[in-house]
Swiss-Prot record:
Gene that produces this protein: TCP23
Biased composition regions of type Basic residues, renumbered to the chain: 50-59
Superkingdom assignment: Eukaryota
Assembly information from the UniProt record: Interacts with SPL.
GO CC list: nucleus
Protein's name according to its UniProt entry: Transcription factor TCP23
Pfam families: TCP (PF03634)
InterPro entries: TF_TCP_subgr, Transcription_factor_TCP
Location of the region described as Disordered in the Swiss-Prot/TrEMBL record: 1-59, 183-218, 313-341
UniProt source species: Arabidopsis thaliana
Length: 341
């Protein structure tokens, strides 16, 4: 009974505690044990590991190579040191700079540059240092372009002497343009058969005079000097003169002026057309004097067949000297015999 009363008193005092009867070691004795209330369990979340960066390099695929180029450790250390010395952003920029510096030696050793075959398909960006992946063009390319530009004006024989051109037809140092005779040097090239070729410049005789080739080219394609006077007295279109200047200078080279005259209307062209004074022009020595005058009256004085084809063009500043020139021209056209009126 006492134990039961004690149980009731304990229940009244401790309302929240749970009483669990337990049998002691001795029979007949009962002990009460209190258990703590249930505690909420906290879940500990493990810290997530950061995502792994891909080890694949960002690169542009090139034929025959992978992502990396294997090199000795000493060479890699030198490239790394040079990158710091030149203050480049990457080692690849330093290697690109080294290739550009060694381009002349590479061309001398291999005959070609370091431009890959698939250069057109690569997406190459210009770096901040201004370096590019382009190799300098070979000397034969520049010589070929210069020859094409000079051949239009007929001066190719002055740029390249025939004795300096190699006689080996199979050599690749000069392009095909130099190994074959130019069209301007042989006027009979069009009359030949398609299978036949003109003689090569290297096969010419050593004692050939280069002046003959120059004179033949000048006689074949004479330079033309353009004169466009605009007389204020005329209301219609003025004449545009093309004066041929040949190398011989004789009267046989003078052609009909009507063949080199074109008419144009100055009203369609805004601005003022000033006349040009050709003071002294010596064809043989390529000497030319130019002067600009304010007046539009032009007088033409042509010298004789001597003096190497000298042609003088003068400007008249007044109207009266021009009439005198026209009087001289009419006298030349209508010669008088001595003693006749």
């Amino acid at each position: 009974m006492e134990s039961h009363n004690n149980n009731q008193s304990n229940n009244n005092t401790t309302g929240s505690a749970h009483l669990v009867p337990s049998m002691g070691p001795i029979s007949g004795s009962v002990s009460l044990t209190t258990t703590a209330p249930n505690s909420t369990t906290t879940t500990v979340t493990a810290a997530k590991t950061p995502a792994k960066r891909p080890s694949k390099d960002r690169h542009i695929k090139v034929d025959g190579r992978g992502r990396r180029i294997r090199m000795p450790a000493i060479c890699a250390a030198r490239v790394f040191q040079l990158t710091r010395e030149l203050q480049h952003k990457s080692d690849g920029e330093t290697i690109e700079w080294l290739l550009q510096q060694a381009e002349p030696a590479i061309i001398a050793a291999t005959g070609t540059g370091t431009i890959p075959a698939n250069i057109s398909t690569l997406n190459i960006s210009l770096r901040s240092s201004g370096s590019t992946l382009s190799a300098p063009l070979s000397k034969s390319f520049h010589m070929g372009r210069a020859a094409q530009n000079a051949a239009v004006f007929g001066f190719q024989q002055q740029l390249y002497h025939p004795h300096h051109i190699t006689t080996d037809s199979s050599s690749s140092s000069l392009p095909k343009t130099f190994r074959e005779e130019d069209l301007f040097k042989d006027p009979n090239f069009l009359d030949q058969e398609p299978g036949s070729r003109s003689p090569k410049p290297g096969s010419e005789a050593p004692d050939q005079d280069p002046g003959s080739t120059r004179s033949r080219t000048q006689n074949m394609i004479p330079p033309m000097w353009a004169l466009a006077p605009t007389p204020a007295s005329t209301n219609g279109g003025s004449a545009f003169w093309m004066l041929p200047v040949g190398g011989g200078g004789g009267p046989a080279n003078v052609q009909d002026p009507s063949q080199h005259m074109w008419a144009f209307n100055p009203g369609h062209y805004p601005g003022r057309i000033g006349s040009v004074q050709l003071g002294s022009m010596l064809v043989g020595g390529q000497q030319l004097g130019l002067g600009v005058a304010e007046n539009n009256n032009l007088g033409l004085f042509s010298g004789g067949g001597g003096d190497g084809g000298r042609v003088g063009l003068g400007m008249s500043l007044e109207q009266k000297p021009q009439h005198q020139v026209s009087d001289h021209a009419t006298r030349d056209q209508n010669p008088t015999i001595d003693g006749s009126p």
